Amino acid sequence: APKHPIPVGMNGAVYMTDLQGGQKTGIFYDQRPNHAFAAKLAKGARVLDVFSHVGGFGLAALAGGASAVLSVDGSAAALELAHQGAEASGVGAQFETRKGDAFEVLGTLAESGARFDLVICDPPAFASSKPALEAGLRAYEKLARMAASLVQEGGYLGLCSCSHAADLARFRSASIRGIGRAGRASALIHTGFSGPDHPVHPHLAESSYLKALFFCL
């Protein structure tokens, strides 16, 4: 495999991919259709991409015409690749990164009065097994509550889960509870899953792991 990051095009954006040191293959192709849907909501929008990794949703949003993107992740290496991807996509001036714990950054942004037209959260698996399910659902609810408070009236919130133990119904319920506890009314406008290159095996529940919920608030 190449030792240096390589550019990969997806949904009109360029992603810099570390094939050796990156998570999985360095880029999350399973999210491709959900990136594309988010991009449709992003024209002219100020976007917050939380747990951004190498810029998955944020760079897709800029390709869709977003005015500005703030990408938040705990990995400095991933954020550097995201920045390189923004430069390679010709949108470096509209792209900003912030390294830190996602929940802490969300709290800081709320305290500062920040608001966004589109907020997307794509965390790692909070419920990676059945024993972790209840704690994971509480984490999804907390994330939804904190993220919802940063969405402008009439804006959009995207919430993702890659936890196969948290099925769609449980994840959706936790997300809706969190949004409600933020004092926000919501309408679920889209439910997304993994792309066709990550098919679901009818006899393997673990293959139906990815869910993406998009709400209008």
Predicted regions and their residues:
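Conserved SAM-binding loop of SAM-dependent methyltransferases across substrates and taxa
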Residues: 54-67
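Non-catalytic substrate-recognition/targeting regions of SAM-dependent transferases
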Residues: 1-27
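Conserved class I S-adenosyl-L-methionine
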Residues: 44-53
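Conserved SAM-binding motif I beta-strand of class I
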Residues: 68-73
